[in-house]
Amino acid sequence: MSKQNLEEIIQTGIADTELSTEISTAIKRPRKYKVLLLNDDYTPMDFVVEVLKHFFHLNEEVAIQVMLQVHFQGKGVCGVFTRDIAETKVALVNEYARMNQHPLLSSMEPE
C-alpha cells in the first residue's frame, strides 16, 4: 500500500466520520402513571367517593363509577399523571385515609 493510498483512506475515513456525526434533538415525553385505588372490605363507599372528588376533582357521577369499579373489580383508575404528580397523589390519599382511620390504599403503575 502506497503512502498516497493510506492518506486517501485516512482522509476518506475522517470525512465519512464527520458526515455521519449528527446531534439528536428528539425530546421524549415523560412517562405517565395510573393512580389506582385498591378495594378493601372496610372503607365506606361514600368515603371513596369523597376521596375521588377531593383529590382527583371528579364529579359525583364519575366518582361513583370509579368507586363501583374499585368495589367490583378490586381496583380502579383515578387518573393518569406524570410520575411526580402521581407519587404526590398516592401519598396524599394514603395519608388522608389513615387520618380518617380507613384502610383505603392508593398505588400507581406505569401506563
Curated annotation (Swiss-Prot):
Coiled coil: none annotated. GO terms for biological process: protein catabolic process; proteolysis. InterPro entries: ClpS, ClpS_core, Ribosomal_bL12_C/ClpS-like. Belongs to the ClpS family. Binds to the N-terminal domain of the chaperone ClpA. Involved in the modulation of the specificity of the ClpAP-mediated ATP-dependent protein degradation. This is ATP-dependent Clp protease adapter protein ClpS.
